[in-house]
Amino acid sequence: MLYYMIALLIIAADQLTKWLVVKNMELGQSIPIIDQVFYITSHRNTGAAWGILAGQMWFFYLITTAVIIGIVYYIQRYTKGQRLLGVALGLMLGGAIGNFIDRAVRQEVVDFIHVIIVNYNYPIFNIADSSLCVGVMLLFIQMLLDSGKKKKEQ
């Protein structure tokens, strides 16, 4: 249940922040938070990361539905006693559903977190994207830990 609560929290935060951006900012408008480093910028994306597969909504609906079903299956089957795995999957589930809602309702994803890292203008993203990335990183860490345990047992 905890892992679904994590997903729900991510979905709520993601949708609330996107709603605030859509209601209070013009498309393309940028608000500096830390000048030359961090901005809130109203942006839309009809594709995936870096705009790849722009406009291929049917593809995103199909893939995201399969991913959501897979994550729920893994949560139900493999997270007992595996807290890190459960948190990773909860974050991934929340992120996947957050962007799925945008695609289903708006036919585009609302992005707004704009970061510049040492003169590199990083692609604008949102809370769902961040949640997916952190979830994948935690999943990778879990896999490394599991691999280390198996080697120790041999």
UniProtKB/Swiss-Prot annotation:
Pathway: Protein modification; lipoprotein biosynthesis (signal peptide cleavage)
Active site positions, chain numbering: 111, 129
Mode of membrane association: Multi-pass membrane protein
GO CC field: plasma membrane
Main location per the UniProt record: membrane
Catalytic reactions of this protein: Release of signal peptides from bacterial membrane prolipoproteins. Hydrolyzes -Xaa-Yaa-Zaa-|-(S,diacylglyceryl)Cys-, in which Xaa is hydrophobic (preferably Leu), and Yaa (Ala or Ser) and Zaa (Gly or Ala) have small, neutral side chains
EC main group: hydrolase
Keyword Cell membrane among UniProt keywords: yes
Name this polypeptide is given: Lipoprotein signal peptidase
Organism: Bacillus subtilis (strain 168)
